[in-house]
UniProtKB/Swiss-Prot annotation:
Classification lineage: Eukaryota, Metazoa, Chordata, Craniata, Vertebrata
Biased composition (Basic and acidic residues): 286-299
Biased composition (Low complexity): 245-259
One Pfam family cited in the UniProt record for this chain: SPATIAL
Superkingdom of origin: Eukaryota
Region (Disordered): 90-117, 132-161, 235-359
Bias (Polar residues): 151-161
Organism expressing this protein natively: Homo sapiens (Human)
Protein name: Uncharacterized protein C4orf17
Amino acid sequence: MNLNPPTSALQIEGKGSHIMARNVSCFLVRHTPHPRRVCHIKGLNNIPICTVNDDENAFGTLWGVGQSNYLEKNRIPFANCSYPSSTAVQESPVRGMSPAPNGAKVPPRPHSEPSRKIKECFKTSSENPLVIKKEEIKAKRPPSPPKACSTPGSCSSGMTSTKNDVKANTICIPNYLDQEIKILAKLCSILHTDSLAEVLQWLLHATSKEKEWVSALIHSELAEINLLTHHRRNTSMEPAAETGKPPTVKSPPTVKLPPNFTAKSKVLTRDTEGDQPTRVSSQGSEENKEVPKEAEHKPPLLIRRNNMKIPVAEYFSKPNSPPRPNTQESGSAKPVSARSIQEYNLCPQRACYPSTHRR
């Protein structure tokens, strides 16, 4: 085989080199191969084809590194590279200048069917799946770990910036250790001590009320709540809550008297006045007349004493009971009124007892 290429082959090679020089941005320019690696093969229509026997591994690594670096810099996919539309590229000699027989590592030709389909389907680079996949991978990448810093100031600033970003993007969980330290510091300031032994002794020997008050004070200071006003409100509401009744109940019982009490007192006085003359009229001595006078003075005292007892007991026991006439003859009287009537009945008998004994 003749190793000296004819003039036509030299012209074709000159055209190909000119095309390669114009399209440096997309094609990878190789160095001039060794003469032992170059050979010419008779192609179609008796046109010689220049081929170069390259190592697949070496060229593959060279092509992969160079093309990937270039695409990462310009961020354009393979399908959008500006390939030449000249007729010289379509010629068979230029096709023969394809470097390696393995076509999987070579970018697609501009006028081949795969490249046409890609161009028809994706008119812009944003619609290209290669670009979208690359952006998705970048978004899914975890943040790089913080590198070792030479100066402490830059390292601290980087750490604070990352901490702020993490706090902004995550839910804040309270740090219980910080709260315990703050509570312990407040407790030491209240007890006026710095030793943990004294704090433990106070916790062991303090009463429950003291512990509750100190804990409420510490938590209120931490929460910035005015505990004194809240405590005053609670103390003012405690007596009303204990009794379960409005504070007007604590007023003297003579303020709120039932309406039927005046009628009861009048009935009692009338009954006593009606009974006393019948008992006194049977006695003719003057001494016996003086004793009923004392008895006449005693029933009003008993009634006055009952004035203080009856309304309060009736108010607490049966506040909503309907008024009923309270007489000696009515058997359905209240127990408190019945007791007062019995006491009244006993008093005149005691007052008249000496006169009957004399008789």
